[in-house]
């Protein structure tokens, strides 16, 4: 019978949103609030605009894995306050 009551401390509202941190190589951290089923390209574009970067210049990774523009936080099993890492695209390599 006790199981019928909602558990205290469990968020029931805002469960479709997630707070994510985007960490740049320069140590900067930008926070975003995004829906769990929204493609991450929306966050990626917003980050680029805010930082004055081009999507072609940088790569986004979560837990060391590349993020595709069509991926969603739900697909990647992201949790609240998770961090996405941003890396500058490396070009060339020979002199």
Swiss-Prot record:
GO terms for cellular component: nucleus. Keywords: Isopeptide bond, Nucleus, Ubl conjugation, Ubl conjugation pathway. Gene3D superfamilies: Phosphatidylinositol 3-kinase Catalytic Subunit, Chain A, domain 1. The keyword Disulfide bond does not apply. This is Small ubiquitin-related modifier 2-B. Polymeric chains can be formed through Lys-11 cross-linking. SUPFAM superfamilies: Ubiquitin-like (SSF54236). There is a cross-link at residue 11 (Glycyl lysine isopeptide (Lys-Gly) (interchain with G-Cter in SUMO)). GO terms for molecular function: protein tag activity; ubiquitin-like protein ligase binding. It comes from the Eukaryota. Ubiquitin-like protein that can be covalently attached to proteins as a monomer or as a lysine-linked polymer. Covalent attachment via an isopeptide bond to its substrates requires prior activation by the E1 complex sae1-sae2 and linkage to the E2 enzyme ube2i, and can be promoted by an E3 ligase such as pias1-4. This post-translational modification on lysine residues of proteins plays a crucial role in a number of cellular processes such as nuclear transport, DNA replication and repair, mitosis and signal transduction. It is found in: Nucleus. It holds the Pfam family Rad60-SLD. Its main location: nucleus. Belongs to the ubiquitin family. SUMO subfamily. InterPro entries: Rad60/SUMO-like_dom, Ubiquitin-like_dom, Ubiquitin-like_domsf. The gene is sumo2-b. Residues 94-95 form a propeptide.
